[in-house]
Amino acid sequence: MNTNVPIFSSPVRDLPRSFEQKHLAVVDAFFQTYHVKPDFIARSPGRVNLIGEHIDYCDFSVLPLAIDVDMLCAVKILDEKNPSITLTNADPKFAQRKFDLPLDGSYMAIDPSVSEWSNYFKCGLHVAHSYLKKIAPERFNNTPLVGAQIFCQSDIPTGGGLSSAFTCAAALATIRANMGKNFDISKKDLTRITAVAEHYVGVNNGGMDQATSVYGEEDHALYVEFRPKLKATPFKFPQLKNHEISFVIANTLVKSNKFETAPTNYNLRVIEVTVAANALATRYSVALPSHKDNSNSERGNLRDFMDAYYARYENQAQPWNGDIGTGIERLLKMLQLVEESFSRKKSGFTVHEASTALNCSREEFTRDYLTTFPVRFQVLKLYQRAKHVYSESLRVLKALKMMTSATFHTDEDFFTDFGRLMNESQASCDKLYECSCIETNQICSIALANGSFGSRLTGAGWGGCTIHLVPSGANGNVEQVRKALIEKFYNVRYPDLTDEELKDAIIVSKPALGTCLYEQ
């Protein structure tokens, strides 16, 4: 595996599938805007999660892939005494922006209270600037970055990792512009610096999106681990005899206002899985570590409990190292403990019942668990949430085992077996984690009835996108699934959609190459 970000050059050879036509269009659009040709294009793709929903903040590994939609940043380096950045977006909804770069080499200011598209570029600029100061302090500590004209173009749908792809492309563009065309940046370094980029606009993500955008490979899924450190390993899908593997990504067009719904949705789920971990720790008399650098895990999480349980009761002092067989064995044990501990309270725990389960007072429980994030609830569904996290983590390992060691006698065997895991994931997201919605369930049902083998939500849920495992090639079902979704979902629920909006709502993709540079 190439450890550095790939660089392609003119004349065009071996460009990523999704980039073959787009690079010509973005070069032309750049020329129409700035009346010169760009020096290079920084590209970063969108992503979808194949299996592994709402388990990353419990530090369990996930299985995403990069897709054939991307953010392109075409760049012309400027030799200016007072350097500035001019940003133009292909989408006219986003106005052109221009900002001066600090002459003393200080960081560009970012105001997270302002919802502004250029802030995401500034996030990438900021982490790239920090990286440059570390690798070449004598050059970048007290002098400004170079100025540039930049044209941004994207076809990544909402929920497909647009902001993360933008920050990755922006960081790569900044490093290339300042270090020259012969400088190589490792995928590891680009992932590491961009994993925290969006924190500067108040988005506390964990690095999965950036790792997927950077490490993506054609025809591969990525096994993204969060312990002992962020790591992405590509795994190739099996070679089939008569079909190709494609994914249909269909947007429900349901937008969940995260600020308004977080107290009953995302924030509440984080609280519930944290309380579940501590209730299990109390019941089995083990201590959970505190992660002070992560408010989500400050009081420990469900993976911490698994490691602590095995340290005490199975004499396994070392935490789980990611081994598939060991992980499957331990997760099955965790599911057994969840049944033993919570199954009598499937209706949920009141604050009084939860505090009793943690051997603390109601006041202590409120202080420790209900003040970090605003939440609203009648009961905490510890059984359902813990069962989802452990069973979903188990499905990730089963999927990985299937990709690395299973033998399939027919193409249909693969689609059936892998699709079953995706369908089980959707059922768990819907019934146990309750992060699906009516529209998501409708799309999944229509797709499954018309040629998809596995259909599920992808991303946070409560709307957003769905992903469907569909055979492609001469005998494939892609067009059949796409046509059914248009006729039975979009035309019924959204009859006023334009052809362009419909085109954007359904994407057909194979696993795509990650972040790269194209030199003109």
UniProtKB/Swiss-Prot annotation:
It comes from the Eukaryota. Disulfide bonds: none annotated. The lineage of its organism: Eukaryota, Fungi, Dikarya, Ascomycota, Saccharomycotina. This is Protein GAL3. The modification N-acetylmethionine is found at M1. Present with 721 molecules/cell in log phase SD medium. The GAL3 regulatory function is required for rapid induction of the galactose system. At normal induction, galactose in the presence of the GAL3 protein may lead to the induction of the GAL genes, including GAL1. Then the galactokinase protein (GAL1) in the presence of galactose may reinforce the induction leading to a higher expression level. Upon depletion of galactose, the inducing activity of the galactokinase protein may decrease, after which transcription of the GAL genes, including GAL1, may decrease. Coiled coil: none annotated. SUPFAM superfamilies: GHMP Kinase, C-terminal domain, Ribosomal protein S5 domain 2-like. GO terms for molecular function: ATP binding; galactokinase activity. Belongs to the GHMP kinase family. GalK subfamily. One of its GO terms (biological process) is positive regulation of transcription from RNA polymerase II promoter by galactose. Pfam families: GalKase_gal_bdg, GHMP_kinases_C, GHMP_kinases_N. Induction: The GAL3 gene is a member of the family of galactose inducible, glucose-repressible genes (which include GAL1, GAL2, GAL7, GAL10, GAL80, and MELI). The keyword S-adenosyl-L-methionine does not apply. GO terms for cellular component: cytoplasm; cytosol; nucleus; transcription regulator complex. NCBIfam families: gal_kin (TIGR00131). Signal peptide: none annotated. PROSITE patterns: GALACTOKINASE (PS00106). Keywords: Acetylation, ATP-binding, Carbohydrate metabolism, Galactose metabolism, Nucleotide-binding. InterPro entries: Galactokinase (IPR000705), Galactokinase_CS (IPR019741), GalKase_N (IPR019539), GHMP_kinase_C_dom (IPR013750), GHMP_kinase_C_sf (IPR036554), GHMP_kinase_N_dom (IPR006204), Mevalonate/galactokinase (IPR006206), Ribosomal_Su5_D2-typ_SF (IPR020568).
